[in-house]
Regions:
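N-terminal regions immediately upstream of nucleotidyltransferase
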Residues: 1-115, 127-136, 143, 147, ...
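Pol beta-like nucleotidyltransferase catalytic core
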Residues: 9-36, 231, 241, 248-251, ...
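Acidic, Ser/Thr-rich intrinsically disordered and amphipathic helical segments
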Residues: 30-34, 52, 56, 60-63, ...
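Eukaryotic basic, amphipathic alpha-helical target segments in cytosolic regions
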Residues: 43-46, 62-76, 111, 126-128, ...
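Conserved aromatic-histidine-acidic binding/catalytic patches
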Residues: 49, 125, 221, 246-250
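Residues in well-ordered beta-strands of folded domains
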Residues: 102, 121, 164-166, 173-175, ...
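Acidic Asp/Glu-based divalent-cation binding sites
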Residues: 115-121
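Conserved NTP/Mg2+-binding pocket subregion across the NTase superfamily
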Residues: 144, 150-152, 157-244, 321, ...
Length: 449
């Protein structure tokens, strides 16, 4: 046995081994610099002032949540105590349990645009109930001078219950996950499956946003490369009319998982290479084969299997006929695993594949230009300008309104702003079904935008 053959294989992130582990060449660095320059030119990065505003919003919400959690704890103590003296002694005997605000989505991944909203989940001990969250915490939010009653909309009956609010000029989606414990662990590891113990499905779904974000960052070889590539993928999807999870197209989580998958396959690649390989891989992807960045949880092997993850339904097309019907599975890494693109229909998938094919042509042009880069070339020279122009083509607006002859437009109206927000959200959630219903083979090829 040779020395090289006796070496243990290097561990890799993800389910499948890397395609290429080569380090970036000089022309890759030049193409990546041109990509970042183009993204900055398009305004996808937030300014320091914008970041300060966002931090202030989170600090304000954290202060309100801390006060609410402490007040709920005092009420719980009062309910258990027999009289006022007992209550005062109980309150003095221990410090109030803490709660935590955890950002997720684009803000946690640090790929948000200046106008992005903040996705955040409030994680609290068991004395903070969902009923109190929608009653007393919502009242506290409405009473805050920076928010006000008109800036808060509670959606209790949503698939994932949420409070939508506006703090100043910043929109926030606030979820709630009460854990089955008297005090939060210190530190709180949301990636530990044990945190799911005793939670109902609404709490699991609320917490999974934070779990997925943390796992995404832990499953990519280089988070900095991942962030640039993801910014590029999201901008491309927006420009081509593909960025809308509610329409059954690509949402933020979908894009993040796809970008992470490519990073795993090319662990040492530069951002420009990852973006190019993104189009190469997914233009030729054999759907409905799933995109996985972590091994899916195994189903219970027996009735005695008591692992936390096994007690919650995870995406599994072998066991679940509904999962088997999904057209383009992009599976979340955190247990219980879910198909983040469950709502993709035939017309949506056709639109995505069409734009992937066009994106592949554009990124191949970038690669050809970069291949002729010389080490002594100036980053402000003609070839660098050509690279930036090539990237701009990738982010050019869609020709959707010049390509088609017939369009369906849905107008939504209501008596007031609050009613319009609710009615518009309901109508939006049904539009993907309208697109699928309109799509008639041989007669109508519906194209959502």
């Amino acid at each position: 046995m040779t020395a090289s053959s006796s070496e243990a294989p290097k561990a890799h992130l993800g389910v499948t081994p890397p395609i290429n582990t080569d380090m970036p060449a000089e022309h890759d660095a030049a193409a990546s610099e041109a990509l970042v320059h183009t993204l900055r030119e398009l305004g996808v990065y937030e300014s320091d002032a914008g970041k300060a505003v966002r931090t202030g919003v989170l600090d304000r919400l954290r202060a309100i949540a801390d006060a609410w959690c402490e007040n709920e704890w005092a009420l719980a103590i009062a309910e258990r105590a027999c009289d006022g003296a007992d209550c005062e002694r109980a309150l003095a005997a221990s410090a109030p349990p803490r709660c935590e605000l955890r950002t997720f989505g684009s803000v946690r991944l640090d790929v948000h645009t200046p106008d992005a909203d903040i996705d955040v989940v409030l994680v609290a001990p068991r004395h903070c109930t969902r009923r109190a969250f929608f009653d007393t915490l919502v009242a506290a939010l409405e009473g805050d001078a920076h928010i006000g009653a008109g800036g808060v909309m509670a959606v209790r009956d949503a698939y994932t219950p949420v409070v939508k609010l506006r703090v100043g000029a910043t929109d926030v989606d606030l979820l709630f996950a009460p854990l089955a414990c008297d005090e939060l662990p210190e530190p709180l590891d949301v990636m530990d499956d044990a945190v799911l113990e005793g939670l109902d499905e609404a709490a699991i779904r609320s917490l999974n946003g934070a779990r997925v974000a943390e796992m995404l960052l832990s499953l990519v070889p280089d988070p900095a490369v991942f962030r640039v590539a993801l910014r590029a993928v999201k901008r491309w999807a927006r420009c081509k009319g593909l960025y809308s999870n509610v329409l059954g197209l690509l949402g933020g989580v979908n894009c993040a998982i796809l970008a992470a998958f490519v990073c795993q396959r090319y662990p040492n690649a530069a951002p420009s290479t990852v973006v190019g390989r993104f189009f190469r891989i997914f233009d030729g992807w054999d759907w409905p084969n799933p995109v996985l960045i972590a091994a899916p949880g195994a189903p219970p092997s027996s009735a005695g299997d008591e692992s936390v993850a096994s007690r919650y339904a995870a995406w599994n097309p072998r066991l679940n006929p509904r999962d088997r019907a999904h057209l383009a599975p992009i599976v979340t890494p955190a247990h219980p695993t879910m198909n983040s693109s469950y709502n993709v229909g035939a017309p949506q998938l056709r639109a995505i594949k069409d734009e992937l094919s066009k994106g592949l042509e554009t990124t191949r042009r970038v690669e050809k230009l970069a291949a002729h880069w010389r080490a002594d070339e100036s980053p402000t020279g003609d070839r660098a300008a050509d690279l930036r122009d090539a990237w701009r083509r990738l982010f050019a607006p869609s020709d959707f309104f010049a390509r088609h002859r017939h369009y369906v437009q849905v107008d939504v109206s209501a008596a007031d702003d609050a009613g319009l927000r609710k009615w518009n959200a309901w109508c939006e959630s049904r539009l993907r079904n309208l697109v699928v219903a309109l799509d008639t083979p041989g007669y109508v090829r519906a194209r959502p935008h």
